[in-house]
Amino acid sequence: MAKPAKRQAKAAVARVDKIGPGRTGGRRAGRSGVIAASRQNARAAKAAARRDAILEAALDEFSAKGFATARLDDVAKRAGVAKGTIYLYFADKESLFQELIRAKMVPVVGSLELALATGLPLRTIVEQAVEIFVREVFGTRRRQVIRLMISEGPRFPALAEFYYREVLSRLLKALRGTLRQAHARGELGSDALVRFPMLLGAPGIIAIVWSGLFDRFEPLDVRAMMRAHFDTLFGAAGASGASGASSAGRAT
């Protein structure tokens, strides 16, 4: 009975020798690596979710009390975390506000930059921009960020400067480039919009202010209002351009 057992043991050793220690060790190392990566991904997802919860709580707290009065203790309570957890992600209240701007508004800036860079006719681009604004800003909590900047910016110039640098300066640069091209193609009768691209964003600001103050008295159809604004704006520009073209025709 001992001999068969001895032969089986030798056969097992031979099989291991044939496979080689590197291959069996490699399998174990591979499994360990997958488990470690999975755990790391889970930790990263949990950290990202906690960070997002803090940002959402900060938006609620800043909106309810203003930047000066809002306390990080209350932000932590809203987010369901300890106050010390906030400092794992943000240095102080100002950096939390700045990251709120960056997280909420910068992705929309990117979408608008892409729309403005298509080279399509200006009115088509503007229609796309209206849809982005209505869907991604006015229809979401992002409009609360803009309300905060309107109310808090004058009292906290550093926050206004940050918003201008991260959001407005990029939008104005993209708008001016698109408007210059449209003017060169004859789509605009003058360079007024190139000089004052803020005119394109004006109805969005009006919509946000109106919705916060007067919407319960007279609800505003934001999309229709913005289109009416652009009809008026480009209608005037088109009339100016047509007048210029007619004058040029008579001169020849």
Language-model features and meaning:
Residues 3, 161, 183-231, 240-252:
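Hydrophobic/aromatic-rich alpha-helical bundle segments in the mid-to-C-terminal region
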Residues 47, 55, 101, 160-172:
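Amphipathic, non-transmembrane alpha-helical scaffold segments
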Residues 53, 57, 61-95, 99-100:
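Helix-turn-helix
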Residues 99, 113-143, 193-200, 223:
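Hydrophobic alpha-helical connector segments
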Residues 137-165, 208-213:
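Amphipathic alpha-helical segments used for helix-helix packing
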